[in-house]
């Protein structure tokens, strides 16, 4: 896996990288949050109820992005991957993974980004969108 992940390092730390890994994984550890129980809960509140699972000898797909650090806040800087099993019944946010090599790796460096915001949405207009870096670290690690 280390050899394949080295090929995912783009020649620029300032571009996005889209990734897809598909195959047999020795282990994949994921976490899943329970979801909101009321509107506008903070990320930290939602993250308190997350649970972790480790799948062993599992086939599935990981998809995600490597986001440049200067865009922290628009998204999550660094690697952000999600996993779903081949039968599409289990998955979550990837915390750790290990493979013996039966994995197909696809990646593409991205040079454009479009950010579309809601128009005419009063709730969005009044929302406090700046999150706490501490809350993000507590949930994302």
Regions inferred by a protein language model and the residue ranges of each:
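Hydrophobic alpha-helical segments and helix pairs
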Residues: 1-6
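A hydrophobic, small-residue-rich beta->alpha segment in the mid-to-C-terminal subdomain
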Residues: 85-128
């Amino acid at each position: 896996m280390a050899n394949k992940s080295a090929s995912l390092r783009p020649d620029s730390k300032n571009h996005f990288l889209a990734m897809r890994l598909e195959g047999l994984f020795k282990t994949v550890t994921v976490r899943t949050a329970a979801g909101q129980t009321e509107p506008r809960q903070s990320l930290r509140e939602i993250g308190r109820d997350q649970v972790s699972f480790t799948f062993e000898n599992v086939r599935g797909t990981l998809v995600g992005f490597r986001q440049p650090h200067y865009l922290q806040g628009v998204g999550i800087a660094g690697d952000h991957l999600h996993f779903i099993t081949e039968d599409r019944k289990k998955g979550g946010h990837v915390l750790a993974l290990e493979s013996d090599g039966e994995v197909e790796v696809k990646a593409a460096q991205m040079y454009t980004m479009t950010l579309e915001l809601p128009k005419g949405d009063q709730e969005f207009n009044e929302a406090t969108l700046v999150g706490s870096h501490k809350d993000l670290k507590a949930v994302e690690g």
